[in-house]
Amino acid sequence: MNEIVSYQPAKLPAAAAQQYQEAARRFLEHSQADNTKQAYETDWSHFLAFVQEMNLPMTGDLLKVAETVVIYITHLAESDYKVSTIERRLVAISRRYEAEGLDSPSKTLMVRQVMKGIRRELGTARQGKAPMLTKHIQRWIKTLGNDIISTRNKALILVGFAGAFRRSELVALDVQDLAFSDKGVIVTIRRSKTDQEGKGQPVGIVYGSDPTTCPVLALEAWLQAGEIRQGPVFRRIRGDRAGGKKITPDRLSDRSVADIVKDLAETVELDPALFSGHSLRSGHITQTDATEDWSMRQSRHKSLIVHRGYKRPSDLLCKKNSSGQLGL
């Protein structure tokens, strides 16, 4: 009585089978809420734009594609995205590949291990970092003295902010990368995320309207004070036996840039935990009155989607909002 009887499926008419297949597709389409599907589409578009900008492989060998995903999530982590956002984008990438009948690079050991490290370092409750704005920098500069550390830090902050530089680009600068003129300075980035071949990307920084906050004058003052004529622009400063400060030949680390930005925030009574080295770059893009075309030239973004990803909710209430241009 309790014997298991083998099951022989009945053959369905072709019309019935097709009807069930169509119903299954309909159920699949309704398996996710509209806002979830929209979020995944947005996440996929961001990933696609990044991959195209970086010229990275999306198909072929699974390990190569996994390396692409690793580079992408590392970029997100370094750009102060929340862990929850990075995880959601991995899901979006996975779903897109699996929908095409391909193995998901998001599920490879390489990607899972890197994501594990990101969670440990950033924490699952991390908030996106705040942009550093002109008003913050102006208040900070008023507190500075004329000592060598203040001179260096002022130049670092102003050049980083005006040039929309990544912290890795700032500390990699050499004197030979600077070309001064009566209009400002051309800074050549020898290698960056969007220039892996090292062809060089020129970035222009013009003289400011206020001498106390002019990035070009601050840079000139630092080079002159430090008697720096070649080699690294931004260098470590150590205490000497006489109790003074000595500029070393050693290049400043990108971690030091983050520390200086956090010190700036604390000095002007902001929460340093909300800021990072990336706050200079995001602050430039968030605040600039330049057109998107010129802003993207300065930040060296090739993708409008990636560039617009820097915009914060507060930007929705800026004076350029079209609701304020209606004469109401």
Task: For each feature predicted by the language model, list its residue ranges.
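Extended, non-catalytic subsegments within catalytic or DNA/protein-binding/adaptor domains
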Residues: 1-328
